[in-house]
């Protein structure tokens, strides 16, 4: 009976994907670890120098889909990396290596690297770092781990492509996001707002990939910030998007699909918060519980799509790409909304950027959302001039009504932020994918999609927006939203014409794809700052210590299902083993007189915290190993294990392993 049930579940899992039609694509998916250094590195996202790592909640992964159109031989690689943002340099280096080592047809237009936008991952991988508010350090080792992990995930998928069927499905996701900038949204025309049922985009779109009728994974687009885990957190975490992926992959594994890859990509999350209470708190008892709840809601929605009948994508893979100098891009009167030609502006942060999003915990106390040129303060301008430089009058006028705080695009000899940015449009059958390096608000996304739809018409039935892709460059708001200068407007770097410039360019790219016209010749490229960066070593990677051996605070002898298990052990700094240790924490279960791993530090129900007490020779380094059991945990005998590397006085790094005393998990009431 057990095997009949298992077969029935697997059959239902793959039922929507069964088809007798001949596949028109080759495809495969893959996943690689890209976890950053877990101790002492500032996290990327909240721009708080005091938020540095002290351990791991979940690991970071790069998940890839590679597709080849069998008839045209064209390729498309789509990756979501669980980091806050992807710099263009990563795409540049990955594309170069793909071209030289794998396939020369890879290029900037068909390698799409999306950031999940977790705010709980280490920074240090951006070349524009000298005056960055997200991190002023550049770590070549962690940059290499991110770059190589993305490359290896694409390579693995490319090498195992098989005839595949691609289907698209949709559903509505409830209680997973809320508009955090409602006053800005309400500034949009009432007639436009009435065209939509909600102030956020609750639609989830999923591209499912199946081989021989069995799903091997999917790419899922739904826009919501991974900010359930707030700036109080000190543990690396992929937040709600990563948890959704882990839940989907675990569910597939139950059906015997051990290589299943679930990509929860980032979309139009610009003004969408998962903190449903709009006060930096979510629906759970703490930040980790809230992250799990919002992640699970996305996972459940994705399962609903899997169980429904999807629409099979027909043959046809095309794409186009261009670099745009957003510091001075002309916007024609047809798109400007002012009746005359306009331009975008050199990038600038506004006062309200420094205010942060109030609903996500806010920023500096000197600022508040809604500050415009009318709210400028002479002492703030003086401090900003001392920290960077004063903006020109031309920049203030171009960015109006933004109260310019830092004129990032006017610094010399080079701008302090990238001005030349990558954009693209890809079509996979009837699915159109807009590619942007920005966080795009709900209404901005709708206008961009409508622009593409107005050109492509019946050539596309589904359109998704892939934000935070191939670079990072702040937000895109509508001109009306920009005028309110909430956080998102203050972080719309290139001024009030930014969205209109992109509407214009996506219109042109849509025409190129519709007519089969050649892409616009590339005359500009992003700056190469390779010779200007000053790489640093990963902190604490060379700390000498004796071999850790002791259990400092053992686990209890017994726990009920649902209780939290912990054990404190002596440890070397985890950064000594950075990128070499597959897991610093294992949960092992005794089965048939043999210990077998059942959990690692990649799982959402484990954590480890690094601590250092004392100074100099009397300092004690330790890890707190934590496992949150659940009602689904099977009774039995378990133990927590720590593995790592230590650097001896002889200069050699060696492995060590510490096993905590075993304990029993029992049913409640026993």
Where are these regions (language model features)?
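N-terminal signal peptide c-region/cleavage motif recognized by signal peptidases
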Residues: 14-16
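Bacterial N-terminal signal peptides that target proteins for export
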Residues: 1-6
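Non-catalytic substrate/cofactor recognition surfaces at enzyme active-site rims
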Residues: 20-670
């Amino acid at each position: 009976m057990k095997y009949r049930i298992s077969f029935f579940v697997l059959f239902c899992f793959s039922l929507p994907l069964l088809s007798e039609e001949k596949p028109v694509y080759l495809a495969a998916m893959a996943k690689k670890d890209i976890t950053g250094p877990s101790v002492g590195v500032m996290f990327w996202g909240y721009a708080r120098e005091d938020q540095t790592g002290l351990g791991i909640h979940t690991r970071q992964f790069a998940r890839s889909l590679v597709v080849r159109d069998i008839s045209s031989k064209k390729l498309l690689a789509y990756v979501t990396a669980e980091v806050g943002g992807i710099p263009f340099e990563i795409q540049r280096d990955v594309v170069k290596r793909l071209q030289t080592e794998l396939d020369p047809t890879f290029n900037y237009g068909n390698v799409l690297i999306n950031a999940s936008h977790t705010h709980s991952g280490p920074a240090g991988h951006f070349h524009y770092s000298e005056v960055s508010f997200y991190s002023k350090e550049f770590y070549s080792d962690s940059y290499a781990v991110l770059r190589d992990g993305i490359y290896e995930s694409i390579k693995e998928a490319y090498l195992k492509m098989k005839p595949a069927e691609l289907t698209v499905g949709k559903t509505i996701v409830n209680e997973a996001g809320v508009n955090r900038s409602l006053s800005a949204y309400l500034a949009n025309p009432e007639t436009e707002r009435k065209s939509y049922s909600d102030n956020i985009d609750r639609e989830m779109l999923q591209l499912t990939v199946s081989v021989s009728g069995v799903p091997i994974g999917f790419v899922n687009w739904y826009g919501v910030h991974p900010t359930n885990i707030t700036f109080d957190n000190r543990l690396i975490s992929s937040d709600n998007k990563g948890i959704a992926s882990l839940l989907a992959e675990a569910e597939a594994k139950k059906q015997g699909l051990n290589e299943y890859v679930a990509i929860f990509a980032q979309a139009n999350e610009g003004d969408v918060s998962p903190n449903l209470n709009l006060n930096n708190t979510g629906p759970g008892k703490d930040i980790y519980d809230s992250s799990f709840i919002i992640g699970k809601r996305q996972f459940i929605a994705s399962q609903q799509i899997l169980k429904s009948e999807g629409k099979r994508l027909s043959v046809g893979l095309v794409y186009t790409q261009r670099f745009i100098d957003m510091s001075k891009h002309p916007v024609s009167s047809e798109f400007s909304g002012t009746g005359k030609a306009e331009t975008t502006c050199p990038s600038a942060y506004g006062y309200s950027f420094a205010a942060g999003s109030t609903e996500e915990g806010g920023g500096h106390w000197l600022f508040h959302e809604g500050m415009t040129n009318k709210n400028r303060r002479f002492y703030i301008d003086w401090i900003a001039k001392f920290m960077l430089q004063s903006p020109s009058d031309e920049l203030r006028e171009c960015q109006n009504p933004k109260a310019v705080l830092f004129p990032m695009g006017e610094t010399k000899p080079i701008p302090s932020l990238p001005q030349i940015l990558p954009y693209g449009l890809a079509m996979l059958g009837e699915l159109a994918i807009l590619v942007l390096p920005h966080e795009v608000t709900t209404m901005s996304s709708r206008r961009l999609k409508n622009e593409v739809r107005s050109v492509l018409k019946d050539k596309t039935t589904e359109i998704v927006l892939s934000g935070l892709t191939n670079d990072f460059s702040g937000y895109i708001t509508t001109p009306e939203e920009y005028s309110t200068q909430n956080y998102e407007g203050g972080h719309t770097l290139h001024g009030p014409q930014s969205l209109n410039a992109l509407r214009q360019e996506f219109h042109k790219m849509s025409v190129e794809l519709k007519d089969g016209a050649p892409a616009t010749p590339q005359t500009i490229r992003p700056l190469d700052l390779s010779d200007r960066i000053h790489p640093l070593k990963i902190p604490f990677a060379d700390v000498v210590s004796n071999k850790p051996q002791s259990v400092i605070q053992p686990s209890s002898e017994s726990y009920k299902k649902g209780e939290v298990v912990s054990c404190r052990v002596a440890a070397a700094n985890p950064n000594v083993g950075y990128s070499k240790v597959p897991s610093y924490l294992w949960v092992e279960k005794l089965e048939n007189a043999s210990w077998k791993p059942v959990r690692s530090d990649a799982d959402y129900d484990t954590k480890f915290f690094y601590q250092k007490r004392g100074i100099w020779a009397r300092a004690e380094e330790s890890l707190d190993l934590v496992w949150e059991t659940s009602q689904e945990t099977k009774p039995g005998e378990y133990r927590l294990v720590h593995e790592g590397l230590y650097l001896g006085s002889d200069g050699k790094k060696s492995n060590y392993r510490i096993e905590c005393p075993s304990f029993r998990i029992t049913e409640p009431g026993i």
